[in-house]
Swiss-Prot record:
Active site: E146
UniProt family annotation: Belongs to the peptidase M48B family.
EC number in record: 3.4.24.-
Cofactor binding description: Binds 1 zinc ion per subunit.
Parts of the chain that traverse the membrane: 4-24, 40-60, 153-173, 193-213
GO molecular function: metalloendopeptidase activity; zinc ion binding
Gene that specifies this protein: htpX
Protein name (database record): Protease HtpX
Length: 300
């Protein structure tokens, strides 16, 4: 509840700042005079922007199962599945959350992810390759990392941030289009953009603003990885968490087998070396994560 209240308060503050700034700059009266109601536009963009993000959140478990072909363990069929259920249950109790669904997905790359609209209605999944190649204490650390994501409410927070950014990408893209249209109509002979011209400007502006928004989301995603690593270290031990990340680092040359829609929720996405790749990366470099744990900079 506190997260929702903080989100609403932050969103209201951003709306007020944007409204005041546009009014002080004379943009709002100018646009209103040219037929664009700022408040109505903002409400429209908020509803559409948040709806898309929240729908994605609510169907995230279903989408994750479908896209990875994950098999939920309802009744353990072997000792490994029994151990997996017991370990997740123990970690969930220690983290103060309800038992999530546990699944295994068929990928040779060592990976895992957590998703779900609620920390008490989540899904934690690990790859078959991870179970084959990692030691039990390392698997436990990876599971603790994912439980940390769930306990921290990262999926919900990320969806809310994405919804706010969706709102402002749509909002400012249409303001830009309206300004261009009004500029072309500045005299009696100007015909403006027309419908297709207006939509073309909106699309281009949404792409530009969307790239900036993606960097913001990626920054938050990287930050939450450090927090999840810290939670994993707290639940499973720093040594085990560091060893698990080191094992993942050894596999960074293996092709990434995670669907694009789940890369932000996986424990690793491979290596990113170039500056632009780092700006849009959902995960920090594994070396940085290992260093942070060793220095206890992010340990909770």
């Amino acid at each position: 509840m506190m997260r929702i209240l903080l989100f609403l308060a932050t969103n209201l503050a951003v709306v007020l700042v944007a409204s005041i700034t546009l009014r002080l700059l004379g943009v709002e009266p100018y646009l209103n005079a040219n037929g664009l109601n700022m408040n109505s536009l903002l409400i429209f963009c908020f509803v559409i922007g948040m709806a898309g993000s929240l729908v994605s959140l609510f169907i995230s478990k279903w989408m994750a199962k479908m896209s990875t072909k994950a098999k939920v363990i309802e009744q353990p069929g072997n000792a490994t599945e029994r151990w997996l259920l017991d370990t997740v249950g123990e970690l969930a109790r220690d983290a103060g959350i309800k038992m999530p669904e546990v699944a295994i997905f068929p990928a040779q790359q060592s990976n895992a992810f957590a998703t779900g609209w609620n920390k008490n209605d989540a899904l934690v999944a690990v790859s078959a390759g991870l179970l084959e190649r990692m030691r039990p204490e390392e698997i436990r650390a990876v599971l603790a990392h994912e439980i940390g994501h769930v306990a921290n409410g990262d999926m919900v927070t990320l969806a809310l941030i994405q919804g706010v950014l969706n709102t402002f990408v749509m909002f400012f893209a249409r303001i830009v289009a309206q300004l261009v249209d009004s500029f072309l109509r500045r005299d009696d002979e100007g015909g403006g953009l027309g419908f297709f011209g207006y939509m073309a400007v909106v699309i281009v502006a949404e792409i530009v603003f969307g790239l900036v928004a993606s960097m913001v989301v990626a920054w938050f995603s990287r930050f939450r990885e450090y927090r999840a690593d810290a939670a994993g270290a707290k639940l499973a031990g720093s040594g085990a968490m560091i060893n698990a990340l080191a094992r993942l680092k050894a596999e960074t040359q293996m092709p990434d087998q995670m669907p694009d829609t789940l890369t932000a929720f996986a424990i690793t996405t491979g290596q990113t070396r170039k500056l632009m790749e780092r700006l849009f990366a959902s995960h920090p470099p594994l070396d940085d994560r290992i260093r942070a744990l060793k220095e206890s900079a992010y340990r909770e």
